[in-house]
Amino acid sequence: FGHTFAHAIETVTDYQSYLHGEAVGIGMVMATDLSVRMNLCESDTADRVRRLIERYGLPVVAPKCSASLMLEAMAMDKKVIGGRMRFVLAKRIGEVSVESDVPQGKLDQTLAAGTNLSQG
């Protein structure tokens, strides 16, 4: 959960800008954002994840990342099967779903929000 985004963050920043745990925290925020956009979970769940990560002083956006470069890195992720990206997305706290049918527009919105280009 969060690692598809986290690995892209680490790749795009050449492992120099964020510690692994920081990248995973940002990835968790992005995964729950995408989950909400896909109507898999309630916005309260995403808010709760974000607040928890912020409470520990971890970043929740990756302004040092390019959304387009993240998308390229994600396309090379080991979880890509048959040319389709797979995401571990939240249904609620403690329950996830593996999704490969993610609309490009929703993913683009999540990447824009997660790289601080917009607030989604």
What are these language model-derived features?
Residues 1-68:
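Active-site segments that bind and position negatively charged phosphate/pyrophosphate groups
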Residues 40-120:
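C-terminal charged capping/lid subdomain of soluble metabolic enzymes
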